[in-house]
Amino acid sequence: MDMAILPAGVWGTALAVPASAAGRRVRLWRRTPGWAESWDRGHPVLPGLKLPENVVACDSAQAAVSDADLVILSPAGAGLRPVCRLVRPHLRPDAVIVCATKSIEPETHLLVHQVVEEELPGHRGRIVALSGPNFAHEVAAGLPTGAVAACPDLSLADWVQQALMTDRFRVYTNPDLVGVELAGALKNVIALGAGISDGLGMGDNARAALITRGLVEMARLGRAMGANPLTFAGLAGMGDLVLSCTGDSSRNRRAGLAIGRGQSAEAFLAETGLTVEGITTARAGWQLAQRLGVRMPITEAIYQVLYEGLPPLTAMERLMARPRAHELEEVAGADLKPPFDP
């Protein structure tokens, strides 16, 4: 099987590790001119990585994808449409597109696979999402990792599972494409909130409550969009959420910590140069919730901190002062409306 991964950023390069270990022929592409000639079979952010001979670098997107059976798109959310447009003239008609990006498009509120469908209409129905609790540096180091390949056509999800699965990179399948993509995007927002809570010194109890109630509102929006609520209890939901809310390598958690300690989001981004998907997804998620009439108080609070100048401490105090509520909600099929009087 021939596989292409674009771009060869940190995440794309890391994915070449299980792909090559599974015996696939992998072509990497990066926009930097001349990078293929100087490539050292690794990535500067992944120290010690040396990819094997079945991974090659390409200077053009055409060279990377023209013979590929499977094409993994791994840009940041803002780069998804440009990468799709770049590869569109060169894709094989039968190529399977794997989306490894976790975002919601800010202007349109489209999920990743919906953006790809617009840009690559000839591949509609041949799009698979790859998601889960995956820090790139751990995948690159060959540490044990679980992931999810999601597609309504389970035969395609199975095919991607087979293409990437190794004894260190375990891939599960799920037909719920919407749920898996939405979970991967929304967990970035909740991870920002967890970082803010920790930055304020709110403690472990508060973080645990925020993670759990954040999962509830993620599933609540998912259900309104036709997703299976149980997806949010799996690797793409709870798994990725726990990792992003607690792992020190989480960009969203790091940004939240800085905001909780008094730094603005703009200053954090300027200082670090990082892409923090949760900052743009907070607005898109909140706007989606408004449009669909879904209650997402944690997402709303984070949106207000980022875009309306609400002090982080005030946001946390407001969340704790909300009316009494039942824990079992419509996500679990219960018909209990807060406030609940015992």
From Swiss-Prot:
User: One Pfam family of this protein, by short name?
Assistant: NAD_Gly3P_dh_N
The biological pathway it contributes to is:
Membrane lipid metabolism; glycerophospholipid metabolism
**Has the keyword Nucleotide-binding been applied to this entry?**
yes
Q: What is its EC number?
A: 1.1.1.94
Which compartments does it reside in?
A: Cytoplasm
Disulfide bond positions? none
Query: Which residues are listed as membrane-spanning?
Result: none
Q: What is this protein called?
A: Glycerol-3-phosphate dehydrogenase [NAD(P)+]
- Organism of origin: Symbiobacterium thermophilum (strain DSM 24528 / JCM 14929 / IAM 14863 / T)
